[in-house]
């Protein structure tokens, strides 16, 4: 199996771990899935060649991942994101041709524990049936993505447990404790150190088999989709209250992320989260927080099997778990900071509870029309102009380390964005001055698209 360790391959092929989760899968279905799995290597190599998506050879895009069509159908409030060059599904649904996200109940038989400690589908990846999961996943993907040539974002949102043992702290510690109980029950005479070592190994290998195997199946069925997991990689730079907060990812986190090479190698896109916690309000630490989270994603992407893998951070327009919309400066610290580092784009996620009232829908529309939309036009236009001016239209502009505060935004002395009120896109007026070009050349450099090279991305070749 492509991308799996020997132990994970064994996990993949072995019979279901837990009899309680396998009755729903007929022998014919399981056998069909296993026959499909034997073709993965060939098909995945083919998928690598066939890849092409909504982000191909575009310097920066924004993708809408919010069900704001509800605002129109229920309250008559039209939150039109398309006029600001935001990619969205038809009727702005969570699942569609441009963007599909799978939550744990929507893809296969993901094992997890409830808040009260009850196991669902076996609870642990090493105690659940991967064959049963893939049989259900096969059907779920076909139902959610009926078009075989789907070329949008394909995001899997699994948050109950993390594939590295060391990252399962606090409420996720139950996955470590139950893993050790599983080993202890089989080997009651083993010392605690040996039990933990075996439990750690079993959990991590099974987690790899589940996560990599699910990606592989998606990539075989919809090879042009940008398959990846929400929230990966993480940086865990949440010590905001520290007086000398730098935002840097702890060394042990980077070391653990290095052990997830199988995940970065298997992903067709990386979707780190840069949601701004409420604790960052008024602290002036948001940019440092976002900067290092994006840097970590770019770091693991560059050393992966495909250094061109798109990085698409997830952004919220609200401070996390609040009803406070981000002010313009925080959009600069999140969307703007991401664009300046040369990511392929960003996903704008909106919780469904934000569209539950007419008032909240009206607030989102006003924010989109007055603040978010114009800023997206600004950043998207600046990224395109910089790509054409510096990178021959064949690469993205990436901020030079010597100018850590530089953002990819238009010079207001050279450009103006004129908003309309009749449903038409805003108009951008102006041209790059010689000074603008000189500033870009000083503060940014090029990261070439696949198939281009050279300082200015003007030469063919990898």
From Swiss-Prot:
Highly expressed in liver, kidney, lung and skin. The keyword Transmembrane helix does not apply. Optimum pH is 3.5-4.0. It catalyses: Random hydrolysis of (1->4)-linkages between N-acetyl-beta-D-glucosamine and D-glucuronate residues in hyaluronate. Pfam families: Glyco_hydro_56. It is found in: Secreted; Lysosome. Residues 1-52 form the signal peptide. InterPro entries: Aldolase_TIM (IPR013785), Glycoside_hydrolase_SF (IPR017853), Hyaluronidase (IPR018155). Residues 446-457 form the EGF-like domain. Glycans are attached at residues 98, 127, 244, 265, 378. Coiled coil: none annotated. GO terms for cellular component: cytoplasmic vesicle; extracellular space; hyaluranon cable; lysosome. Keywords: Disulfide bond, EGF-like domain, Glycoprotein, Glycosidase, Hydrolase, Lysosome, Secreted, Signal. Its EC number is 3.2.1.35. GO terms for biological process: carbohydrate metabolic process; cartilage development; cellular response to fibroblast growth factor stimulus; cellular response to interleukin-1; cellular response to pH; cellular response to platelet-derived growth factor stimulus; cellular response to tumor necrosis factor; cellular response to UV-B. Disulfide bonds join 71-361, 235-249, 386-397, 391-446, 448-457. One of its GO terms (molecular function) is hyalurononglucosaminidase activity. The active site is at residue 159. PANTHER family: HYALURONIDASE (PTHR11769), HYALURONIDASE-1 (PTHR11769:SF23). May have a role in promoting tumor progression. May block the TGFB1-enhanced cell growth. Belongs to the glycosyl hydrolase 56 family. This is Hyaluronidase-1. It comes from Mus musculus. The lineage of its organism: Eukaryota, Metazoa, Chordata, Craniata, Vertebrata. The gene is Hyal1.
């Amino acid at each position: 199996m492509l991308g799996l360790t020997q132990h994970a391959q064994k996990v993949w092929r072995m019979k279901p771990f837990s009899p309680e989760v396998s009755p729903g899968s007929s022998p014919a279905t399981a056998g069909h899935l296993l026959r499909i799995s034997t073709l993965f290597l060939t098909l995945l190599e083919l998928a690598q060649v066939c890849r092409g998506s909504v982000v191909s050879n575009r310097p920066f895009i924004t993708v809408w991942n919010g069900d704001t069509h509800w605002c129109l159908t229920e309250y008559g409030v039209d939150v039109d994101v398309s006029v600001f060059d935001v990619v969205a599904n038809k009727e702005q649904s969570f699942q569609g041709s441009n963007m599909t996200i799978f939550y744990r109940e929507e893809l296969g038989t993901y094992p997890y524990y409830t808040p009260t400690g009850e196991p669902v589908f076996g609870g642990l990846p090493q105690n659940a049936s991967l064959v049963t999961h893939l049989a259900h996943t096969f059907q779920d993907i076909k139902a959610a993505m009926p078009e075989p040539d789907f070329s949008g974002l394909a995001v899997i949102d699994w948050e109950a447990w993390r594939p590295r043992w060391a990252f399962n702290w606090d409420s996720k510690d139950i996955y470590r404790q139950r893993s050790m109980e599983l080993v202890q029950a089989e080997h009651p005479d083993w010392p605690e150190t040996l039990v933990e070592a075996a439990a750690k190994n079993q959990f991590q290998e099974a987690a790899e088999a589940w996560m990599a195997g699910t990606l592989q199946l998606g990539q075989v069925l919809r090879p042009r989709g940008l398959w990846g997991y929400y929230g990966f990689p993480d940086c865990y730079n949440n010590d905001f209250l520290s007086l000398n907060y730098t935002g840097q990812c702890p060394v042990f986190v980077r070391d653990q992320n290095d052990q997830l090479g199988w995940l970065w190698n298997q992903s067709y896109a990386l979707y780190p989260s840069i949601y701004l916690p409420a604790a960052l309000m008024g602290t002036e630490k948001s940019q440092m927080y976002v900067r290092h989270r994006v840097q970590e994603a770019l770091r693991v992407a560059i050393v992966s099997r495909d250094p061109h893998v798109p990085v698409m951070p997830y952004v919220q327009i609200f401070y996390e778990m609040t009803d406070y919309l981000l002010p313009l400066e925080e959009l600069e610290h999140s969307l703007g900071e991401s664009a300046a580092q040369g990511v392929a784009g960003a996903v704008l996620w909106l919780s469904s509870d934000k569209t539950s009232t007419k008032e909240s829908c009206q607030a989102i529309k006003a924010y989109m029309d007055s603040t978010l939309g114009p800023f997206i036009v600004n950043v998207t236009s600046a990224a395109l102009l910089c790509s054409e001016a510096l990178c021959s239209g064949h690469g993205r502009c990436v901020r030079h380390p010597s100018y850590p505060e530089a953002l990819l935004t238009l010079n207001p002395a050279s450009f103006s964005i004129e908003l309309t009120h009749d449903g038409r896109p805003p108009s951008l007026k102006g041209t790059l001055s010689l000074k603008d070009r000189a500033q870009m050349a000083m503060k940014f450099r090029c990261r070439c698209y696949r198939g281009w090279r050279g300082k200015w991305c003007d030469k063919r070749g990898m």
